[in-house]
Design a protein with these regions (language model features):
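Residue at a beta-strand N-cap/secondary-structure junction
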Residues: 25, 52-55
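Short alpha-helical elements of helix-turn-helix
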Residues: 13-15, 54-58
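The alpha-helix within a helix-turn-helix
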Residues: 21, 32, 62
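Short alpha-helical DNA-recognition segment
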Residues: 25-44
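DNA major-groove recognition helix of helix-turn-helix/homeodomain DNA-binding modules
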Residues: 56-71
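DNA major-groove recognition helix of helix-turn-helix
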Residues: 46, 57, 76
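Short amphipathic recognition helices of helix-turn-helix/homeodomain-type DNA-binding modules
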Residues: 71-78
């Protein structure tokens, strides 16, 4: 049985997009253009406010940043 929302309270997925962009010397605007997302949607992801991400979006970001999903996302339990 999957964990309930109560079991996950305090746990969160961390998005490490800032670190990857800095390492690649790429702006958020440039990445948005390359992956076909609006700057607003990519900003929501970058700030950790996104509730979900499509695999196709994740794949496009990883393609452009030359990284693996685990380089972009992390899990933190409280």
């Amino acid at each position: 049985m999957p964990p309930s929302n109560d079991d996950l309270e305090g746990a969160r997925i961390m998005v490490k997009l800032d670190d990857l962009l800095y390492a690649r010397r790429m702006t958020l605007t440039e990445l948005a253009d390359r992956v076909g997302l609006t700057l607003a949607n990519l900003s929501i992801l970058k700030t950790g406010k996104a509730k979900a991400i499509r695999f196709s979006t994740l794949a496009a970001i990883c393609r452009e940043l030359d990284c693996q999903p685990g380089d972009l996302l992390g899990y933190k339990a409280d």
